[in-house]
Amino acid sequence: MAVNNFSFTFLGTGTSAGVPVIACDCDVCTSEDPRDKRLRCSACIRFTDAGGIDRVILIDTSPDLRQQVLREKLERCDAILFTHQHVDHTFGLDEVRRFNMVMNQAIDIYAEQATLQHLHRVFNHVFESNKNVNDSFVANLIPNELQPDEPLCLF
């Protein structure tokens, strides 16, 4: 598929605790240098597809996702690719529910089996309607299992 306006943006490149780290007085954490202020790991790919639709693919959903999305002025999310199941890469998943509302559609998520199982366990209120005891607005997600060494075609 031909794409235009392709960009890859690191949304966060910090450690699992972010930088600065809470209650740390080391030189990096107390630095005034803006390069020493780093959010946790996420990234996004933006492009215009062959049909002229602007697309956004998130890579991981860090706990800092809301702040990252606001900073980058992202207004949609067409898919999410999870690299692995660590909480610093998954705990921002709840934030994507606003994209569901804006786009009026579900979001495909892609991950290996172990990561999908982790997401189902941690966010059971999203994947199992009977676990959403308050009937609150939750993300509308479509899980897709990735197979190791197999190509991935999103659109």
Predicted regions and their residues:
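Binuclear metal-dependent hydrolase catalytic cores
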Residues: 2-155
